[in-house]
């Protein structure tokens, strides 16, 4: 049976101590034979609303901490890059390079990521027609010498895409579940359940969010039939230094993931 992809971890590396505490609580997912698990955290949040917002420890220290998670817990790592020159050093640690939603059309960034040995996760921009993500996927595939298109070509060559909501007026996002079906024509699809409930800039210099909708939307995405899920999670989201309002508390993640596995099994049995 095909494994469900699960990407989870704190939004940003706040400290090595916090990262290890979260990784300790996520290790059961890494050991689950039905899950392909990736630990996620960012070394630099370069697109924060305010210049005064916490960004993370930076490239050098951040990669050391992510490598220590890999060494201690045997987890694969996903982290995002914002500049082309970050691709090579980050790929020495990360198994997946993530392209931020705001940068999903940036050719140089996509090409730099695709030139590495890492997989590439392209987050669909909040502004983007879901069918247009195919052009970003093609940039990555053609960089890897692949002229074929479609789901199978992307899957075989380590390229997948993520839905994280679409702009719905000012300071709000909405999830169009049709996007999951459309994007899956071009690549494996991950549903970013936590950023999809974000309210950009709604907290006055930072983003707000409605975390009570994370689990219902994740269940809906599972019922559509996709490849995996992305959750930013924290021991205490209220104290998180980034994206706390839309994070899922670690205490809720286990039951949520178990439910998603059950839904996916039902979908597979009825196809």
Swiss-Prot record:
Gene3D superfamilies for this protein: Aldolase class I
Gene Ontology cellular-component terms listed: cytoplasm
Any Gene Ontology biological process: keto-3-deoxy-D-manno-octulosonic acid biosynthetic process
Cited InterPro entries: Aldolase_TIM, DAHP1/KDSA, KDO8P_synthase
Domain of life per record: Bacteria
Chief location of this protein within or outside the cell: cytoplasm
Locations listed in the record: Cytoplasm
EC annotation from Swiss-Prot or TrEMBL: 2.5.1.55
Record key words, sorted: Cytoplasm, Lipopolysaccharide biosynthesis, Transferase
Top-level EC class: transferase
Pathway noted in the entry: Carbohydrate biosynthesis; 3-deoxy-D-manno-octulosonate biosynthesis; 3-deoxy-D-manno-octulosonate from D-ribulose 5-phosphate: step 2/3; Bacterial outer membrane biogenesis; lipopolysaccharide biosynthesis
Record's catalysed reaction(s): D-arabinose 5-phosphate + phosphoenolpyruvate + H2O = 3-deoxy-alpha-D-manno-2-octulosonate-8-phosphate + phosphate
GO molecular function, one term: 3-deoxy-8-phosphooctulonate synthase activity
Family in the record: Belongs to the KdsA family.
Alphabetized PANTHER family for the sequence: PHOSPHO-2-DEHYDRO-3-DEOXYHEPTONATE ALDOLASE (PTHR21057)
Protein's recorded name: 2-dehydro-3-deoxyphosphooctonate aldolase
Origin species: Campylobacter jejuni subsp. jejuni serotype O:23/36 (strain 81-176)
